[in-house]
Amino acid sequence: MDEIRKTGRVTIPTDLDVVPETLEILKKWGADAIRDCDGTDFPQQLKDADAKIYSTYYTTRKDNAWAKANPDEVQQCYIMTGFYTAPGDTVTIPLMKGISPELMQVNTNDDITRWWEVMDRTTGQPVPPEQWSYADGSVTVQAVPFHEYTVSFLAYLIWDPVHMYNATTNGWTNFEHQITFDVRQPKTHKYSMERLRKFIAEHPYVNVIRYTTFFHQFTLIFDELKREKFVDWYGYSASVSPYILNQFEQEVGYKFRPEYIIDQGYYNNQYRVPSKEFRDFQAFQRREVAKLAKEMWTSPTRAGARP
């Protein structure tokens, strides 16, 4: 009786140093596909294996040359300081205390009086920009004694949060931090589409392109010791910039406030009831991501690969 070959619906990961093991498991398990993943590289020896090739494609990172050459289009997010009680008529708040300096860098390039927000948490009201100032990594506030204050500010994600999460969790060493760039901004959008077409042309053996981190960032915040400070795998809150927020304002017809994302320091986690403004923001982000996803989906299908 002829042997019936049973293969399919199993995908196995691989790396440069496990080629023989990959082929062995491919045969034993009857897998029909091989893939790489974050932190691994696809071995060229396997491109002619009797299996489909799935290739991970990073739409927002793994191109530090571009990110370093275009720092104005590095991805950004909002972050809030801790609560600081005013001991007198002023209080000075350090912005990066409790935040990993490897992960974030304060954005002082854009108008801080427009895009930052100092909050009197005792009254729940914003402090007018003329009553606070920034210098040397801290904000000094003209305060009401014994009131609590926070600062919400924009920061560049100088280490991709997912890459940092994977590196920290797996204990990686001797690697370059991948900088995350904003595919929705003009220069990077144009470059990213050219980059994708080039990847497809140079990898004709790839059957399926596995997109990861699809133009938006999860909110992953680490402290100075690389411990998780806040993690939200579901939202779009770490995908902001003045460029994007100006578009949001034009669509919804009202002025954006950092507090819509910060939410008193809760960051609109899944246990919070979202405000109308945050729901508007989520809907806007979702439509923008879907529009760009459609554009990136079209390129590989035209070239014969599957996204």
Residue ranges and their predicted role:
Residues M1-P307:
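Glycan-processing catalytic domains of CAZymes
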